């Protein structure tokens, strides 16, 4: 075992991981969104977006307009929801309030909001507005997250390739 070679491998791995982290944080700052890239997980927005599409978000708009596709998070639920703005209002403090609906859903999203909420607050609940997408690229992440053997195989492959790398 060559200590110098092992330390070099470890430092390269740290460099790759920290570079990926810094890229993600830089993208988050540029888009003003803690999650600037998301994968569509359901068919509620068909035909506009299919399950597995990768969406690119932007959250620097002061206001959302009726017809915008936004991603929002509901308290106590970790999965972001991709739906279209159906109505837009303002409260007494001039805060924008939004009502959303999936294109492929029969009704609006009020039942999803929870806790007697009838609107989303733009500043608090909206993660971002969709500005672009890549069709079906996200199926890989869906497959890995839904298949425990795929997760283990990927982790094993990455671990073995890191150990066997000579550069």
UniProtKB/Swiss-Prot annotation:
Region (C-terminal short (CTS) helix): 153-164
All ranges on the Cytoplasmic side of the membrane: 1-12
Species this protein is from: Zygosaccharomyces rouxii (strain ATCC 2623 / CBS 732 / NBRC 1130 / NCYC 568 / NRRL Y-229)
Catalytic residues (UniProt): 44 (charge relay system), 83 (charge relay system), 109 (charge relay system)
Location(s) in or outside the cell: Endoplasmic reticulum membrane
UniProt protein name: Signal peptidase complex catalytic subunit SEC11
PANTHER family: SIGNAL PEPTIDASE COMPLEX CATALYTIC SUBUNIT SEC11
Protein topology in the membrane: Single-pass type II membrane protein
GO MF annotation: an example: serine-type endopeptidase activity
């Amino acid at each position: 075992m060559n200590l110098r070679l092992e330390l070099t491998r470890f430092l390269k791995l740290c460099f790759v991981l920290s570079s990926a982290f810094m890229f993600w944080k830089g993208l988050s700052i540029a888009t003003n969104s803690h999650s600037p890239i998301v994968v569509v997980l359901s068919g509620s927005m068909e035909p506009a977006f299919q399950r597995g599409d990768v969406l690119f978000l932007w959250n620097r708009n002061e206001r959302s307009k009726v017809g915008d596709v936004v991603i929002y998070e509901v308290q106590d639920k970790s999965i972001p929801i991709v739906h279209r703005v159906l109505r837009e209002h303002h409260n007494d403090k001039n805060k924008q309030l939004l009502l959303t609906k999936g294109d492929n859903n029969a009704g609006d999203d009020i039942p999803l909001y929870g806790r007697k909420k009838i609107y989303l607050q733009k500043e608090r609940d909206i993660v971002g507005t969709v500005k672009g997408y890549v069709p079906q690229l996200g199926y890989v992440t869906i497959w890995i997250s839904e298949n425990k053997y795929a997760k283990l195989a990927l982790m094993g492959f990455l671990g073995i390739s890191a150990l066997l790398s000579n550069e």
